[in-house]
């Protein structure tokens, strides 16, 4: 078992500087350069100072409007993709008023900032296990997962969240080194038993991890919402 998380050990400005350095490293990804991938990496974003929740998804696709090579500004998961935000609203993590922005067919820069500011207000940070943006929904390579897991661990250490939520088995396994059946995890939650796990030691600190189903695409959004609701009780 790891030691408890040390809260407020970094000044907020320090976190910004550390994340900027990390993001520069991400943007120099050797995998994207080797493949000639022109899509921009999708970085983490939201509340960066000990957020209540640190949500980890798998990998972004071209559907994220901030992946466009011509985009300048924030690059946060699921920008312009409405179905993910419905899951967070239905689970009680975001106010329903956010639908005025997230249900738009076409987002603009103001919409991106509206969602980013809402994440800060509610204490959420969003990121992906692999930041490389794909042209389809295919899973990332083993090599990319290994490389980006190290980056994710740095990101966690900078942000110092109170709880990590892993959406899907791939980020859960990368974070904890364990494998579980999410259906069993859900059944235990239905009986009132919430299971939490710990990250592989990140320095001297282990962070709590709560797994849930991937919320969009080939995932299980209804089951993901159900587990997230149990978590918020």
Whereabouts are the PLM-identified features?
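A polyanion-binding, active-site-adjacent surface
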Residues: 2-188, 193-195, 204-231
């Amino acid at each position: 078992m790891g030691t408890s998380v040390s809260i407020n050990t970094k000044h907020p400005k320090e976190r910004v500087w550390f994340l900027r350095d990390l993001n520069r490293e991400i943007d120099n990804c050797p995998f994207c350069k080797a493949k000639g991938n022109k899509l921009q990496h999708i970085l983490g974003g939201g509340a960066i100072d000990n957020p209540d929740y640190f949500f980890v998804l798998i990998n972004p696709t071209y559907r994220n409007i901030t992946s466009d090579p011509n985009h300048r500004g924030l690059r946060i998961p699921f920008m312009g993709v409405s179905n993910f935000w419905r899951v967070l609203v239905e689970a009680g993590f975001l106010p329903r008023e956010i639908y005025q922005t997230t249900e738009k067919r076409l987002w603009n820069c103001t919409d991106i900032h509206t969602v980013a500011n809402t994440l800060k207000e509610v204490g959420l940070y969003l990121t992906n296990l692999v930041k490389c943006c794909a042209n389809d929904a295919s899973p990332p390579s083993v090599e990319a997962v290994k490389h980006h897991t190290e980056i994710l661990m740095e990101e966690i250490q900078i942000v110092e969240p109170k709880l990590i939520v892993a959406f899907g088995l791939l980020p859960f396994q990368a974070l904890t080194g364990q494998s579980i059946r999410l259906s069993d995890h859900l059944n235990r939650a239905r009986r009132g038993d919430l299971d939490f796990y710990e990250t592989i030691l990140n320095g001297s600190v282990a962070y709590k991890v709560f797994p849930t189903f991937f919320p969009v695409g080939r995932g299980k959004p209804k089951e993901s919402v159900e587990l997230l609701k149990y978590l918020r009780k």
